[in-house]
């Protein structure tokens, strides 16, 4: 019987039969900015499909990630990764904090994508942290930071093109990375998920918000939005 190891806001981790492997289950839960938890029936199934599809695509272009295989409607078999205590957020359009903190017009397109690092801590409200702090805190070496930034740009470039092909703009994406050890050596590996839960996705023509942003404002329409994204990706 699998043992529950961790339960987050939208995913649950279980033990697997083999060492250094885990089972990751996608739930229907979503935590709003107010802290309220809501259930969007069927969201977990769609996120499992979307994330496994996108991780497979990234593997094909040489981005190593934790996905081994999708094992059922809600669960994936994944590689154990020692996850870094940071999130990597890459944005190509003014949204979220750029509007709130800098007073920018939502939708303003940056000349180049902007990469931010945030501490993975809900308790401290995910504070921004810079490269020198990350290095001095001993979380990543400067060389690891360089690799993470390069991979983030490559992932974003690839996913942006893929989403444009289905009429959706990838405005912002939140990624997580970690280390996988092989003896004394380690490699950087993409982990967590890539889904409408951690990507800002807008209709390319109307800028209508899709995915998690819709849950925040119009939760009754959220499932249809996730379904739209999954269906369009299925056609690729």
Curated annotation (Swiss-Prot):
Keywords: ATP-binding, Ligase, Nucleotide-binding, Purine biosynthesis. GO terms for molecular function: ATP binding; phosphoribosylaminoimidazolesuccinocarboxamide synthase activity. GO terms for biological process: 'de novo' IMP biosynthetic process; cobalamin biosynthetic process. The keyword Kinase does not apply. Pathway: Purine metabolism; IMP biosynthesis via de novo pathway; 5-amino-1-(5-phospho-D-ribosyl)imidazole-4-carboxamide from 5-amino-1-(5-phospho-D-ribosyl)imidazole-4-carboxylate: step 1/2. The keyword Secreted does not apply. It catalyses: 5-amino-1-(5-phospho-D-ribosyl)imidazole-4-carboxylate + L-aspartate + ATP = (2S)-2-[5-amino-1-(5-phospho-beta-D-ribosyl)imidazole-4-carboxamido]succinate + ADP + phosphate + 2 H(+). One of its GO terms (cellular component) is cytosol. Its EC number is 6.3.2.6. Belongs to the SAICAR synthetase family. HAMAP family: SAICAR_synth. This is Phosphoribosylaminoimidazole-succinocarboxamide synthase. It comes from Rickettsia prowazekii (strain Madrid E). The lineage of its organism: Bacteria, Pseudomonadati, Pseudomonadota, Alphaproteobacteria, Rickettsiales. The gene is purC.
């Amino acid at each position: 019987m699998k043992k529950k190891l961790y339960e987050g806001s939208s995913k649950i981790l279980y033990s697997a039969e083999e060492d250094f492997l885990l089972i990751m289950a996608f739930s229907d839960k979503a935590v709003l900015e107010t802290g309220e938890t809501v259930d969007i029936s069927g969201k977990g199934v769609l996120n499992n499909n979307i994330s496994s599809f996108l991780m497979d695509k990234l593997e094909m272009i040489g981005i190593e990630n934790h996905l081994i295989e999708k094992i059922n409607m809600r669960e994936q078999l994944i590689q154990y990764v020692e996850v870094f205590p940071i999130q990597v957020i890459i944005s190509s359009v003014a949204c979220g904090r750029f509007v709130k903190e800098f007073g920018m017009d939502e939708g303003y397109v940056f000349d180049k994508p902007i990469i931010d690092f945030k501490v993975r801590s809900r308790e401290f409200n995910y504070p921004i942290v810079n490269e020198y702090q990350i290095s001095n805190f001993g979380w990543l070496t400067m060389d690891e930071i360089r690799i993470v930034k390069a991979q983030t740009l490559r992932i974003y470039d690839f996913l942006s093109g893929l989403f444009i092909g289905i009429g959706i703009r990838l405005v912002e994406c939140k990624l997580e990375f970690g280390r996988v050890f092989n003896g004394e050596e380690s490699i950087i590996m993409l982990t967590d998920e890539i889904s409408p839960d951690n990507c800002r996705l807008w209709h390319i023509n109307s800028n209508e918000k899709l995915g998690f942003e819709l849950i925040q404002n119009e939760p009754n329409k959220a499932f249809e939005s996730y379904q739209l994204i999954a269906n369009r990706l299925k056609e690729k």
